[in-house]
């Protein structure tokens, strides 16, 4: 529900009394409907995905590995703990999961350098690209992680956001690997409004899994991190998935998908790189092909690009450096909520319109985005055939501006390619 107001079905329950047990029982039912039988002893609640991941990493210890790029809220948790975070390239066709061979090589390198790799975080729907990794790719990453002795945390916060009802369901890796995967689901933005922080974790029903759950619960208790009482009843209702909420969720996903595909079409037609989005609420656009035109404007890296585009567009964008990308990579994440309108109230008509792209706000936002792209394309000098700009500003252009062969380098969680401690505003 990111970018939209809370429906009365949820906001009207803020004053109702509910306990953690009500939310846990609803969560068990939510997972059971997706083929993932879950007992209450394996479920843990927290006030938001960031707090839950922070506690889980504190409980497990060691370095973490993440696909590059990754969700903006993953890396800061490692930084807060003073842990090293090591980005791993993804396959060229989609994000969310690391290339298995690159993962194994990264683990070997970290071990040679004296590191302590213990946790891999991946996503079944990739934020920021909006892509969905194939189940075979997820399985390959999990097998590689198991061979490296890594604990796998799967972020399933966006699993219920496919843009089209005709797309295959997003499956949980925990169905095929029930003893090896910790499932993390941030309800804020998916089943609840984005500013209602409540998250769930499902731990394997094994001695090791339940021990990790207990240690994670201890970390949350030590931090005084408990879900806000008024959110428990709405969360339990959202997890029960009554028909009216399911219909609204489908309408929201459809609206995000329409503007995401429209922006993708405009970006690629102008010569930029972008993977076709299938789910979620964002699009990652690589403007590397316009490097010289951007340099003429003083735009040399992702920080400059973010500032330049935010001054020219009516909606916010965020530089790829906030998502673990190298600073020289000229990529930005576009939250699709901004394309639908400047406020939740302005976006609401898109849920019922037969043609949301014809509404004034989406039409204006897409038109301005297209104008910026046309300007860059018109001022970019021609390049010799077969040359272009890779994500780091050198070499040959790759599919969607990314190359799974680039193994990258590890980054210290205190420095490098994260957000630098800044909040990613509007990253809905």
Predicted regions and their residues:
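Conserved core segment of the aminotransferase class I/II
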Residues: 180-251, 267
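Short Gly/Ser/Thr- and Asp/Glu-enriched loop/turn motifs at secondary-structure junctions
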Residues: 39-41, 230-232, 276-282
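PLP-dependent enzyme catalytic core of the Aspartate aminotransferase-like
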Residues: 308-317, 323-395, 399-406, 416-428
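Conserved core of the PLP fold type I
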Residues: 10-144, 160-175, 358-363
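Conserved glycine-rich beta-strand-loop-beta hairpin in the small C-terminal domain of fold type I
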Residues: 250-264, 273-293
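Short, flexible/disordered intra-domain loops and linkers
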Residues: 93-98, 130-132, 162-168, 211, ...
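Helix C-cap/helix->beta junction micro-motif
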Residues: 81, 147-148, 177, 270
């Amino acid at each position: 529900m990111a970018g939209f107001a809370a429906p009365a079905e949820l906001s009207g329950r803020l004053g109702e009394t509910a306990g953690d047990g009500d939310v846990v029982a609803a969560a068990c039912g939510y997972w059971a409907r997706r083929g993932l039988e879950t007992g209450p002893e394996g479920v843990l609640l927290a006030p938001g995905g960031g707090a839950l991941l922070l506690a889980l990493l504190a409980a497990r210890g060691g370095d973490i590995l993440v696909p590059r790029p990754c969700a903006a809220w993953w890396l800061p948790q490692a930084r807060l703990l003073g842990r090293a975070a090591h980005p791993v390239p993804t396959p060229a066709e989609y994000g969310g999961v690391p290339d298995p061979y690159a993962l194994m090589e990264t683990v070997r390198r970290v071990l040679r350098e004296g590191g302590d790799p213990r946790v891999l975080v991946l996503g079944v729907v990739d934020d920021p690209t909006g892509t969905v990794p194939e189940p075979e790719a997820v399985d390959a990453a999990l097998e590689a992680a198991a061979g490296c002795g890594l604990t796998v945390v799967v972020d399933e916060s966006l699993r219920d956001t496919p843009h089209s009802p005709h797309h295959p369901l997003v499956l949980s890796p925990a169905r095929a690997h029930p003893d090896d995967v910790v499932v993390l689901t941030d309800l804020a933005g998916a089943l609840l409004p984005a500013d209602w922080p409540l998250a769930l974790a499902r731990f394997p029903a094994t001695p090791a899994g339940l021990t990790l759950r207990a240690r994670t619960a201890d970390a949350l208790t030590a931090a005084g991190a408990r879900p806000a009482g008024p959110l428990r009843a709405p969360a339990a209702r959202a997890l029960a998935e009554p028909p009216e909420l399911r219909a609204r969720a489908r309408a929201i996903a459809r609206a995000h998908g329409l503007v995401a595909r429209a922006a993708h079409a405009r970006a690629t037609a102008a010569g930029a790189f972008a993977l076709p989005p299938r789910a979620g609420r964002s699009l990652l656009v690589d403007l590397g092909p316009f490097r010289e035109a951007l340099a003429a404007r003083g735009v040399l890296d992702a920080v400059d690009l973010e500032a330049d585009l935010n001054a020219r567009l009516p909606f916010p964008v965020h530089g790829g450096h906030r998502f673990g990308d190298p600073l020289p990579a000229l990529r930005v994440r576009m939250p699709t909520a901004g394309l639908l309108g400047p406020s939740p109230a302005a976006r609401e008509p898109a849920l019922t319109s037969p043609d949301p792209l014809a509404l004034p706000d989406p039409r204006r936002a897409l038109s301005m985005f297209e104008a910026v792209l046309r300007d860059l394309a018109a001022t970019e000098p021609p390049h010799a055939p077969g040359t272009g700009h890779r994500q780091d500003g050198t070499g040959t252009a790759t599919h969607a501006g990314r190359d799974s062969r680039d193994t990258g380098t590890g980054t210290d969680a205190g420095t490098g390619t994260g957000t630098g401690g800044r909040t990613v505003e509007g990253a809905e």
